[in-house]
UniProtKB/Swiss-Prot annotation:
<protein>
    <recommendedName>
        <fullName>Uncharacterized protein SPAC823.17</fullName>
    </recommendedName>
</protein>
<dbReference type="GO" id="GO:0140057">
    <property type="term" value="P:vacuole-mitochondria membrane tethering"/>
</dbReference>
<keyword id="KW-1133">Transmembrane helix</keyword>
<dbReference type="GO" id="GO:0005742">
    <property type="term" value="C:mitochondrial outer membrane translocase complex"/>
</dbReference>
<dbReference type="GO" id="GO:0030150">
    <property type="term" value="P:protein import into mitochondrial matrix"/>
</dbReference>
<keyword id="KW-0812">Transmembrane</keyword>
<feature type="transmembrane region" description="Helical">
    <location>
        <begin position="21"/>
        <end position="43"/>
    </location>
</feature>
<keyword id="KW-0472">Membrane</keyword>
<dbReference type="GO" id="GO:0005739">
    <property type="term" value="C:mitochondrion"/>
</dbReference>
<dbReference type="GO" id="GO:1990816">
    <property type="term" value="C:vacuole-mitochondrion membrane contact site"/>
</dbReference>
Amino acid sequence: MDRISAQKDIFKKVVNKENSSIFVSLGVFAVSVAILKSRLGNFLVPQL
């Protein structure tokens, strides 16, 4: 729970400092990277 609350505080600081559009684009980029990592992991782990 502490980690989630810390992330929310960071998100609030980012939103306050940057435009919401930039924050949304960064969020979408992070999600896409996470999906790519999960897919690559699924492909590479069985091969190893």
